[in-house]
Amino acid sequence: MARGCLCCLKYTMFLFNLIFWLCGCGLLGVGIWLSVSQGNFATFSPSFPSLSAANLVIAIGTIVMVTGFLGCLGAIKENKCLLLSFFIVLLIILLAELILIILFFVYMDKVNENAKQDLKEGLLLYNTENNVGLKNAWNIIQAEMRCCGVTDYTDWYPVLGENTVPDRCCMENSQGCGRNSTTPLWRTGCYEKVKLWFDDNKHVLGTVGMCILIMQILGMAFSMTLFQHIHRTGKKYDA
């Protein structure tokens, strides 16, 4: 009976972590594809030049893939050392997430202010030779979200000149339209648009976050239960 429960728990955890590992592989693949296909598609922030969408997805994918592999191997080998390592890794990730969320809400006003300032400083690099990625990023977000600048369209004036904005700020985009002072522009800043997007999708984002939290807690519960079960039955596959 005990052995049957152990087998059931072992393969349940293996399948759970196999899905986890496959998700990590998928994220890693998407990150590599973004890095290769988008070239210098970079971050908006000059303070964190390596924090691009591609690098972020690659980092998350790698962490998920390694964690999933650790859980798969620990479960199928019934290795207490690997199971305990898997539990500790998930616990560290969970605590880091909670700390970041708490800090974000405690210092929300300061985060918003610093983010706006950093993004405005990034605008100064818009037309520089080595920052094609930043230029592409701004062009895409302004076209997709129908916004202009960080707080509003006037953020571009110190960068491109008085009454001059990127062409993607125009409601009807055409070559050179940003230099025409009579052209209708998107007047809302992109920072506000992004905040509105998060607010409109907060229920979906909350659901996704809750699913991730449940998966982490289940992973920790499975690993510790299997660890205790192996310990009680005297199964020894320790490295």
Swiss-Prot record:
Pfam families per the UniProt record, alphabetical: Tetraspanin
GO terms for MF: signaling receptor binding
Subunit description: Found in a complex with GP6.
Keyword ATP-binding in record: no
SUPFAM superfamilies linked to this entry: Tetraspanin
GO cellular component, one term: membrane
PANTHER family: TETRASPANIN, TETRASPANIN-9
Modifications after synthesis and translation: Glycosylated.
Record key words, sorted: Glycoprotein, Membrane, Transmembrane, Transmembrane helix
Tree of life domain: Eukaryota
Tissues in which the protein is found: Strongly expressed in megakaryocytes, platelets and lung. Weakly expressed in bone marrow, brain and kidney (at protein level).
CDD domains xref list: NET-5_like_LEL
InterPro entries, per database record: Tetraspanin/Peripherin, Tetraspanin_animals, Tetraspanin_CS, Tetraspanin_EC2_sf
Matching PROSITE patterns: TM4_1
Protein name from the UniProt record: Tetraspanin-9
Glycosylation sites: N180
Cytoplasmic domain ranges by topology: 1-13, 77-85, 225-239
Extracellular side of membrane: 35-55, 107-203
Parts of the chain that traverse the membrane: 14-34, 56-76, 86-106, 204-224
Family: Belongs to the tetraspanin (TM4SF) family.
One biological process term in Gene Ontology: platelet aggregation
Subcellular location: Membrane
Topology class, membrane: Multi-pass membrane protein
